[in-house]
Amino acid sequence: MDTGVTSPRVLVVDDDSDVLASLERGLRLSGFEVATAVDGAEALRSATENRPDAIVLDINMPVLDGVSVVTALRAMDNDVPVCVLSARSSVDDRVAGLEAGADDYLVKPFVLAELVARVKALLRRRGSTATSSSETITVGPLEVDIPGRRARVNGVDVDLTKREFDLLAVLAEHKTAVLSRAQLLELVWGYDFAADTNVVDVFIGYLRRKLEAGGGPRLLHTVRGVGFVLRMQ
């Protein structure tokens, strides 16, 4: 019986036919509509023409690799959530994927249930907003314009990605309160489970560098063993 509910559309990209078939089958059984691509160029065409709700993308592919695909999508202002898959587990590799604009990074091998949970988290995050505030929040020389999605330090605009601003907005709305990694994963990335990822630390690092680039004071502080807080020292 047709319930009128449309299943989320996921584009899965991998040049390994066995992996691709396995992911397609698993995601379909989990309730997703699935399209596939076997290389980066095909993935970029499909993402542009068919507008999937999320992309699961292997990082090592012929023609156009995963990082290049994400970079191209973001350059076209396509903010589709992307989960990058890779056998590379080093921090540098994860950072490269995230800096390109990926929303999540999952190391192979992984359990299908975790991939499904992460895709659902990305979709939840996309369907909501990082914050409901309608004000400009000030912390020392930092101004966070929530409705305008702009940040300024000493009156100078700070160039932030969508995810960086989402994280900063959440921290600003809870200024002086220490938020744990788990809380930030849920509020910013939409995770409702204990994800094994250092994505919060990576993005905190991005924000610190950008906020302090002009010689501004340290505003983002780490509370060892607890989490992170936005405040003047």
From Swiss-Prot:
* Induction annotation: By nitrogen-limiting conditions.
Its transmembrane ranges are none
Taxonomic superkingdom: Bacteria
* Keyword list, A-Z: Cytoplasm, DNA-binding, Magnesium, Metal-binding, Phosphoprotein, Transcription, Transcription regulation, Two-component regulatory system
UniProt binding sites for Mg(2+): 15, 58, 60
Q: Which residues carry this modification: 4-aspartylphosphate?
A: 58
> Could you give a GO molecular-function term held by this entry?
calcium ion binding
GO BP of this protein = regulation of DNA-templated transcription
Q: What's the PTM story here?
A: Phosphorylated by PrrB at Asp-58. Also phosphorylated on Thr-6 by PknG/PknK/PknJ. The two phosphorylations act synergistically to activate the DNA-binding activity of PrrA.
Q: Which residues bind DNA?
A: 134-232
Quote the cellular component terms of the Gene Ontology held in the record: cytosol; plasma membrane; protein-DNA complex
An example of a Pfam family matching this protein is Response_reg
Which compartments is it annotated to reside in?
Cytoplasm
Q: Where is the Response regulatory domain?
A: 9-123
Residues with the Phosphothreonine modification: 6
What does this protein's UniProt record list under function?
Member of the two-component regulatory system PrrB/PrrA that is involved specifically in early intracellular multiplication of Mycobacterium and is essential for its viability. Upon phosphorylation by PrrB, functions as a transcription regulator by direct binding to promoter regions of target genes to positively regulate their expression. Autoregulates its own expression.
What is the protein's name according to its record? Answer: Transcriptional regulatory protein PrrA
- Species of provenance: Mycobacterium tuberculosis (strain ATCC 25618 / H37Rv)
